Curated annotation (Swiss-Prot):
It comes from Xenopus laevis (African clawed frog). Its main location: secreted. Residues 197-233 are annotated as: Disordered. This is Preprocaerulein type-4. Belongs to the gastrin/cholecystokinin family. Keywords: Amidation, Amphibian defense peptide, Cleavage on pair of basic residues, Pyrrolidone carboxylic acid, Repeat, Secreted, Signal, Sulfation. The pharmacological activities of caerulein are quite similar to the physiological activities of gastrin and related peptides.
Length: 233
């Protein structure tokens, strides 16, 4: 729209050519000025209308600006209040959280104190129980000395037992030697007894031959006896 108005003004200026009609220059100049004034007023009115259409009158724009500023101020104030409330709430929350932490610390100290009390009580109870089971410290010391003496005695006993084992080994070798001697003596005695009962080897051989002859004779006698019995039958 503005471009159309400017083109109209330019066309009006170009159409007012003073060289074409020099005799009527004053009249035409007044006409051009009147037309230009008319176009200027029209342009101003158009601009005013457009301005009012877009943003209203200057007073309206000022009022709008003030209203917008007031709205912006209100928004800013609202955001500030919101941020302040949030900050206050956060601060209050942190204060409450810190207060709860302090209370938790107090409770924790109470619990630790009670735990320390229980620990001391348990330690005292264990000490009393230990004294009851093992006696007083002097009694426990005496028991320890007695146990050490018993251990020393056991150690000495094991040493003696080992020493006795070595002595038993020696005695065992002696017994084995004496047993071997007895075995040899018994063998010799049996040999002597066998010789005494059956005579010398030559005599035993003669006895064996005699016994064989007697057996052969007995066998022959039995054969003859059987043969005679068969003939009799």
């Amino acid at each position: 729209m503005f471009k159309g108005i400017l083109l109209c003004v330019l066309f009006a200026v170009l159409s007012a050519n003073p060289l074409s009609q020099p005799e009527g220059f004053a009249d035409e100049e007044r006409d051009v000025r009147g037309l230009a004034s008319l176009l200027g007023k029209a342009l101003k009115a158009t601009l005013k209308i457009g301005t009012h259409f877009l943003g209203g009158a200057p007073q309206q724009r000022e009022a709008n600006d003030e209203r917008r500023f007031a709205d912006g101020q209100q928004d800013y104030t609202g955001w500030m209040d919101f941020g302040r409330r949030d900050g206050q709430q956060d601060y209050t929350g942190w204060m409450d959280f810190g207060r709860r932490d302090d209370e938790d610390d107090v409770h924790e100290r109470d619990v630790r104190g009670f735990g320390s009390f229980l620990g001391k009580a348990l330690k005292a109870a264990l000490k009393i129980g230990a004294n009851a089971l093992g006696g007083a410290p002097q009694q426990r010391e005496a028991n320890d000395e007695r146990r050490f003496a018993d251990g020393q005695q056991d150690y000495t006993g094991w040493m003696d037992f080992g020493r006795r084992d070595d002595e038993d080994d020696v005695n065992e070798r002696d017994v084995r030697g004496f047993g071997s001697f007895l075995g040899k003596a018994l063998k010799a005695a049996l040999k002597i007894g066998a010789n005494a009962l059956g005579g010398s080897p030559q005599q035993r051989e003669a006895n064996d031959e005699r016994r064989f002859a007697d057996g052969q004779q007995d066998y022959t006698g039995w054969m003859d006896f059987g043969r005679r019995n068969g003939e009799d039958d």
